[in-house]
C-alpha cells in the first residue's frame, strides 16, 4: 500500500509499505529518501506520536494516509532553583477589639458628673476633637506640635 509523509520543508513524499511494517521500518525508508537518521525522526499520525516497535496496523494507518515528520528535540529545559527566603515573612498586625474601650477616656465622679480624662488642644488651628498625647512630664499635640508642661 502507498502512504504519504509530509516532511519538515512541507514536501510530501510517497512510501510503499505494508500494514504489517513497523514504524522503525518506515523511518528507515524515510532515511533512504530524505537522509534524516531514524533516531532524529518523530512521526505523527492523527495527533499521536508513533512508537518505534509498533506496526502501521496498530495505529489504523490505511492506504493513502498522511504521516507528519518532525525532528526530535534533544535535552530539556534548565531546572530552575527554588527561591529560598532568608528572613521570615512579617506577621500582620491583628486588631484587638476591646469592648467599651471608650469608657477609658472619661471619668464619672460620685455625684454623676462626667469629665474627660484627655485634654483637647487649645490652639485655634487644631480645633475641637484634637486630643493631646500624655507623656511622663508633658502633653503633646500631634497636629500643631505644641508642648504643654505638666506640673506634678
Curated annotation (Swiss-Prot):
SUPFAM superfamilies in the record, alphabetically?
A: Ubiquitin-like (SSF54236), Zn-binding ribosomal proteins (SSF57829)
ZnF start-end (C4-type): 121-144
Its transmembrane ranges are: none
Q: Which InterPro entries match?
A: Ribosomal_eS31, Ribosomal_eS31_euk-type_sf, Ribosomal_zn-bd, Ubiquitin-like_dom, Ubiquitin-like_domsf, Ubiquitin_CS, Ubiquitin_dom, Ubiquitin_ubiquitin-like
**What SMART domains does this protein map onto?**
Ribosomal_S27, UBQ
One GO biological process term: ribosomal small subunit assembly
Q: What else is known?
A: Ubiquitin is encoded by several different genes. UBI1 and UBI2 genes code for a single copy of ubiquitin fused to the ribosomal proteins eL40A and eL40B, respectively. UBI3 is a polyprotein with one copy of ubiquitin fused to ribosomal protein eS31. UBI4 is a polyprotein containing 5 exact head to tail repeats of ubiquitin.
> Family per UniProt?
In the N-terminal section; belongs to the ubiquitin family. In the C-terminal section; belongs to the eukaryotic ribosomal protein eS31 family.
Question: Which PANTHER family does the annotation name?
Answer: UBIQUITIN
Protein name listed in UniProt: Ubiquitin-ribosomal protein eS31 fusion protein
Query: What species is given as this protein's source?
Result: Saccharomyces cerevisiae (strain ATCC 204508 / S288c) (Baker's yeast)
Amino acid at each position: 500500500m502507498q502512504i504519504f509523509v509530509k516532511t519538515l520543508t512541507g514536501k510530501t513524499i510517497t512510501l510503499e509499505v505494508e500494514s504489517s511494517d513497523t514504524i522503525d521500518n518506515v523511518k528507515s525508508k524515510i532515511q533512504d529518501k530524505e537522509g534524516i537518521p531514524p533516531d532524529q525522526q518523530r512521526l505523527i499520525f492523527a495527533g499521536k506520536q508513533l512508537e518505534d516497535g509498533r506496526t502501521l496496523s496498530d495505529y489504523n494507518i490505511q492506504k493513502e494516509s498522511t504521516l507528519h515528520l518532525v525532528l526530535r528535540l534533544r535535552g530539556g529545559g534548565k531546572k530552575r532553583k527554588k527561591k529560598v527566603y532568608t528572613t521570615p515573612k512579617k506577621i500582620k498586625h491583628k486588631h484587638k477589639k476591646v469592648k467599651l474601650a471608650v469608657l477609658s477616656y472619661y471619668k464619672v465622679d460620685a455625684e454623676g458628673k462626667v469629665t474627660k480624662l484627655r485634654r483637647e488642644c487649645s490652639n485655634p488651628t487644631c480645633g475641637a476633637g484634637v486630643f493631646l498625647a500624655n507623656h511622663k512630664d508633658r502633653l503633646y499635640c500631634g497636629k500643631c506640635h505644641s508642648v504643654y508642661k505638666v506640673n506634678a
